[in-house]
Amino acid sequence: MKPVIALVGRPNVGKSTLFNRLTRSRDALVADLPGLTRDRHYGEGRVGARPYLVVDTGGFEPVAKDGILHEMARQTRQAVEEADVVVFIVDGRNGLAPQDKSIADYLRKTGRPIFLVVNKAEGMKYTAVASDFYELGLGDPRAISAAHGDGVNDMINEALEVAYAGEPQESEEAAAARGIKIAIVGRPNVGKSTLVNTLIGEDRVIAFDMPGTTRDSIYVDFERNGKHYTLIDTAGLRRRGKVFEAIEKFSVVKTLQSISDANVVILLLDARQDISDQDAHIAGFVVEQGRALVVGVNKWDGLDPHVRERTKADLARKLKFLEFAKFHFISAAEKTGIGALMRSVDDAYAAAMKKLPTPKLTRALIEAVEFQQPRRRGPVRPKLRYAHQGGQNPPIIVIHGNALDAVTETYKRYLENRFRETFSLTGTPLRIEFRSSTNPYADKD
């Protein structure tokens, strides 16, 4: 699973600036979830082939007793507990503050790897910047400028060396033997643990821990109708005897890690509750990660027909961006609708891994353009010449041509729908990339 880097420090030391630098964005992938302060954000970064999650915590007051500072401190502690590496940021311009000492005292007790980072060090000699902070007892300070990027790459590379050390690497053969990896995600109390137990059956549980990170990752292998699957622990499912029960402390980090690690995600919703912003944020992260998706609307049994219609309308309105996914109305407790749900899991995975031959893609592209040409932008009309597959899981279709910057988002969605229909790409996000070039085979017989 992707390691977690937590950014910790008192207010105004540059945590958000470093967050934006590491994630190469000005916003979080998942933000403002209910129960979280607006100052705690989650994003994704990558160095080469090493992806990671980064948590931007609020300003930390370790001894805050009540109010918003207490809540921010509680959430920061949770972020530290879930982190593989903690980056403790201090302010090189203003020097050592009493609050820095309190935070350092707390962090030393956690047992987490700590990287002491002195920010705002641009234009200053290292000895002058670092000297004050040795007394924190956290080793050699690393001087950076989050605003300008100085020293950031070296720092994050060192942090990832620590975070990935001891991470168990699974062979391709072992991964294939596991079958489809499924993450079941959703808010607390939507029925995740009930669905897990319905899927695996009490007498077929094979659970084991994979040590090597600060959080043991629980995988559950099971077989259904002769097919092998692996369930990934999602946000607090823990085994008690032969049954899995939900620990109702919603963990954003675990949810994001599980989604990233999965082949297919089952987003579980509660038919008896309104669709929340949190549901939409989780769904958005699944799409952003390019994961195949099936939506299960649980607790459907016994609902009044009028309530069912209202729920369907609510789903269509609030989750319109999931039109590519299959929705199933199920009861995990009564074990109804589960077979169809799992068939959609198989179909979504098959779609995500489908191979799309270049001749067929190009033919589909030409037919789409003949049916509806892209609009001109001023005097320029885009010319779409040929297409090939650029990747799987999710499928990536690369379109070559001229003046492709003029292709509108509306036309891009039109092409996506045409490709989905032609190649039966239900249940998976689809990426379309445009590259201005010429077809090397255009003038050849």
Curated annotation (Swiss-Prot):
Residues 3-167, 180-353 form the EngA-type G domain. GTP 1 binds at residues 9-16, 56-60, 119-122. GO terms for molecular function: ATP hydrolysis activity; GTP binding; ribosome binding. Residues 354-438 form the KH-like domain. GO terms for biological process: ribosome biogenesis. PROSITE patterns: G_ENGA (PS51712). Keywords: GTP-binding, Nucleotide-binding, Repeat, Ribosome biogenesis. GTP 2 binds at residues 186-193, 233-237, 298-301. GTPase that plays an essential role in the late steps of ribosome biogenesis. PANTHER family: GTPASE DER. Associates with the 50S ribosomal subunit. Belongs to the TRAFAC class TrmE-Era-EngA-EngB-Septin-like GTPase superfamily. EngA (Der) GTPase family. HAMAP family: GTPase_Der. This is GTPase Der. It comes from Burkholderia pseudomallei (strain K96243).
